[in-house]
């Protein structure tokens, strides 16, 4: 896999330093001069230029010396660090697989072994996997068949660990920050954590003496995981009488997962993860090891009787009836130990710091246990009827029970029915349509059920460690109940109806499969906030009905068929329309951007403002008022309901894929891709730096309309074109709004402009339709004569390119994962396939 590139046009060192200097001169310079004689004056410190000009931190010697400051800033232009190159690499993976099979009429076997080894894109990331898969079929007598299978795998992975996301850091870190000092030691980042420190929160944000270096974090901290899992199953097929069978299956699965996270004492991650009052100390340093052990066990036992008989030459009946029980148990134990020595494995608790009761509470939270248990029971039956080769009728019924619901709603009976007419088996149709090679008309209707495993009907209490209530001589452990219990919580139910037509022409050189579907999901489980007077914050309940309908078409064609040449193509197209038919939350106060479901609109509906440009007088974003907006006073211009429109959906209504294959003799090339059309998304990255990282108590504030207007958002790296902004001398033809200081309250913008984020977020709304070439695969197979000389059955070589080409109008990093700072990876892989 190929490491990501910096494709979003970020500023280089010279551009970023010039931008910071421009902001200092506009927003800080005059206030800084005032602060020299009046310590009540607050001025913003943005970027390293702000720290240098103000003489803060390691730049106190430069205070007041403009020439020295300019010289130092000029030297920083020579540092142009590409953090993507330092933190990521081209990933390399290899896989080796061996399979063996054989047997006789009485028994057959199959064994497959596999080894995968991968060094990931992030430095120090590695992954290993070993797996074995074996099957055996025994036929001791004609009326008994026994299938025995076993699958086992072990995965081992190791990845660097940091409290700072390396993907975000690579994107937002300032390019003038050095990775290493001249002596080879880790260079401290002078800006990543300094915004709050130099803007009112210095007491709160104590930094380690050696500063913060992400490379130190990734080189010193790691998380290692080992996972072992296996499945054993046995299936027995007994012929009781000639038309009657019994099939029984028993399966057991287990998974053991262990994770160790080791944090070195000299890292920033360890500095921020200490007990009591140690988080304010620069000397009492210690690392830790966090260990997590999880065991999961599950089983499935299933049995059914099957009856299959043909009456005469035209009528065949298949009937099946059976039952299934399954369950799973999981247990997780976690512990965290400080002062960990990786050489000896020893640990010790740090000395008590701060209030002892608070310190004890933190220690008690270092260890704990989770456990869960689920049980399901199902009863099912089905019947199929065949009229010759032309008509097929089928019906099925099942009822499932789940421990996830209250006793009165544990079981959910469902059924389905379908029919198929094989038109291609009708002689009169084939005579009338000689080009037709096959055709089937099919229809189905039925009901299914689904369990929302993230919810529970039970009253669940989360105990608070080291917090008690005393009553008389008794002591009670305190706890919280996050959601209200709901004994009426039940299954989500889905009603399905489908009609399809499959046909082939010219001996199946062209095949077309079409299907229209209608799907109605009722009793969809949602969470809804409830009045605080109930004692709860939210409750889960069956509240929504959602309709989906659409059509799916798949076309396959053999475009060219000659002795040495073949060319074939396939395309799949799907259209889906969905709508929320009913949604009745416990409490409703109008449509907001937080609503997951809104009646009359599709799921994933986007409600926001209609962006209409940047106001030339204020420099703020403008949005179109609704036709029904009621503006009686200037403050009505601030109300979000006066601007809210339905703007589309985050779920693409048009999706599909395609494949084109061509071969010449032993050489074959295959190109496959996918497309997604009609969806929208918010291209809104969460900036690590903003006014919310700062604090000046007692200072009046001005509401910031968007992160593009936030002066403090420019503390870390931004796009090159951010300089194309509104200013008093540049009021039209600009891309970005005015930049202003949150602590400079003189405009009163929020009184007569929309400020609600659900309206403002419209400026981040993008159409993320795209067409992507997912893979290009070139394969060469040795001629059979050459293979025979090597005493092989087959030998082929292949090379593939994945995710190399994308066609889109979306200007973010990746339309498939919008808003990302790390795109879908491109990769090149090769393989050899040997058959004996």
Say what each PLM segment does.
Residues 1-74, 333-341, 541, 558-650, ...:
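Conserved small-residue
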Residues 272-284:
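Aromatic- and acidic-residue-enriched carbohydrate-binding clefts of CAZyme catalytic domains
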Residues 4-8, 86-87, 434, 661-759, ...:
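C-terminal beta-signal and adjacent terminal beta-strands/loops
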Residues 1-230, 235-237, 306, 316-317, ...:
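Membrane-proximal, glycine/serine-rich, low-complexity loop/turn segments characteristic
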Residues 76-83, 365, 639-642:
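Short Pro/Gly-enriched beta-strand edge/turn motifs at strand-loop
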Residues 87-91, 371-372, 488-490, 648-649:
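Short Gly/Pro-enriched turn/cap motifs at secondary-structure boundaries
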Residues 63, 129-130, 135-144, 149-154, ...:
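Extracellular/periplasmic, surface-exposed regions of secreted and cell-surface proteins
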């Amino acid at each position: 896999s190929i490491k990501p590139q910096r494709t979003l046009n970020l500023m280089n060192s010279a551009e970023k330093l010039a931008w910071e200097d421009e902001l200092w001169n506009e927003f800080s310079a005059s206030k800084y001069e005032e602060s020299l004689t009046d310590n009540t004056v607050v001025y913003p410190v943005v970027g390293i230029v702000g720290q240098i000009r103000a003489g803060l931190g390691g730049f106190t010697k430069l205070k007041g010396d403009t020439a020295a400051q300019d010289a130092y800033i000029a030297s920083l232009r020579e540092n142009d660090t590409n953090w993507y190159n330092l933190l990521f690499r081209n990933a390399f993976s290899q896989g080796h697989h061996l399979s063996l099979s054989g047997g006789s009429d009485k028994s057959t076997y199959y064994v497959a072994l596999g080894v995968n080894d991968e060094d990931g894109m992030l430095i120090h990331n590695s992954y290993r996997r070993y797996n074995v898969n074996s099957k055996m079929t025994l036929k001791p007598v004609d009326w008994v068949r026994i299938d025995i299978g076993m699958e086992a795998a072990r995965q081992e992975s190791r990845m660097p660990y940091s409290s700072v996301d390396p993907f975000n850091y690579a994107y937002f870190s300032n390019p003038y920050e050095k990775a290493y000092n001249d002596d080879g030691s880790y260079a401290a980042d002078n800006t990543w954590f300094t915004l709050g420190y130099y803007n009112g929160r210095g007491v709160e944000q104590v930094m380690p003496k050696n500063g913060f270096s992400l490379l130190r974090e990734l080189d010193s901290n790691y998380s290692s995981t080992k996972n072992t899992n296996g499945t054993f199953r046995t299936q027995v097929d007994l012929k009781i009488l000639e038309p009657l069978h019994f099939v029984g299956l028993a399966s057991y699965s287990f998974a053991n997962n262990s994770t160790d996270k080791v944090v070195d004492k000299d890292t920033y991650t360890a500095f921020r993860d200490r007990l009591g009052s140690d988080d304010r100390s620069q000397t009492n340093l210690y690392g830790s090891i966090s260990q997590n052990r999880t065991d999961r066990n599950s089983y499935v036992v299933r049995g059914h009787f099957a009856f299959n008989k043909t009456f005469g030459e035209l009528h065949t009946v298949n009937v099946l009836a059976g039952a299934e029980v399954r369950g799973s148990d999981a247990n997780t134990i976690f512990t965290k130990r400080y002062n960990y020595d990786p050489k000896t494995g020893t640990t010790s608790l740090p000395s008590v710091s701060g209030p002892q009761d608070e310190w004890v509470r933190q220690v008690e939270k270092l260890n704990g246990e989770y456990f869960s248990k689920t049980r399901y029971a199902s009863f099912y039956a089905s019947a199929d009827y065949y009229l010759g080769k032309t008509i097929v009728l089928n019906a099925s019924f099942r009822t499932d029970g789940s421990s996830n619901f209250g006793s009165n709603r544990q079981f959910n009976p469902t059924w389905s029915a379908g029919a198929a007419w094989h038109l291609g088996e009708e002689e009169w149709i084939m005579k009338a349509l000689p080009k037709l090679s096959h055709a089937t008309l099919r229809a189905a209707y039925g009901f299914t059920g689904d369990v929302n495993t993230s919810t529970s009907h039970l009253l669940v209490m989360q105990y608070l460690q080291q917090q008690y209530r005393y009553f008389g001589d008794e002591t009670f452990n305190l706890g919280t109940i996050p959601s209200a219990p709901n004994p009426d919580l039940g299954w989500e139910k889905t009603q399905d109806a489908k009609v399809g037509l499959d046909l082939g022409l010219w001996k199946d050189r062209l095949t077309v499969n079409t299907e229209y579907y209608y799907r109605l999901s009722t009793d969809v489980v949602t969470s809804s906030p409830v009045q605080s007077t109930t004692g709860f914050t939210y409750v889960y309940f069956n509240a929504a009905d959602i309709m989906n309908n659409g059509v799916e078409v798949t076309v396959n064609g053999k475009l060219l068929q000659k002795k040495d040449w073949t060319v074939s193509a396939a395309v799949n197209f799907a259209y889906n329309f969905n709508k929320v038919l009913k949604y009745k939350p416990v409490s409703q106060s109008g449509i907001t951007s937080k609503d997951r479901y809104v009646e009359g609109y599709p799921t994933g509906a986007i409600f926001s403002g209609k962006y209409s440009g940047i106001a030339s007088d204020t420099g703020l974003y403008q949005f179109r008022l609704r036709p029904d907006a009621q503006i009686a006073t200037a403050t009505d211009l601030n109300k979000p309901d006066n601007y809210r429109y339905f703007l589309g959906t985050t779920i693409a209504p048009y999706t599909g894929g395609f494949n084109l294959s061509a071969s010449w003799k032993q050489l074959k090339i295959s190109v496959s891709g996918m497309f997604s059309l009609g969806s929208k998304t918010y291209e809104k990255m969460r900036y690590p730096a903003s006014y919310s990282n700062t604090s000046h108590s007692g200072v009046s504030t001005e509401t910031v309309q968007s992160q593009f207007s936030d002066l403090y958002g420019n503390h870390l790296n931004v796009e090159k074109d951010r300089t194309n902004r509104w200013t008093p001398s540049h009021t039209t033809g600009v891309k970005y709004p005015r930049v202003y200081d949150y602590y400079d309250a003189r405009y009163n913008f929020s009184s007569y402009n929309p400020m609600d984020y659900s309206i403002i977020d419209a400026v981040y709304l993008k159409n993320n339709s795209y067409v992507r070439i997912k893979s290009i695969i070139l394969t060469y197979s040795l001629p059979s004569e050459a293979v025979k000389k090597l005493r092989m059955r087959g030998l082929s070589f292949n090379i593939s390119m994945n995710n190399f080409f994308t066609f889109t109008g979306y200007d973010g990093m990746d339309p498939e994962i919008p808003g990302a700072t790390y795109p879908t990876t491109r990769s090149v892989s090769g393989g050899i396939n040997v058959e004996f």
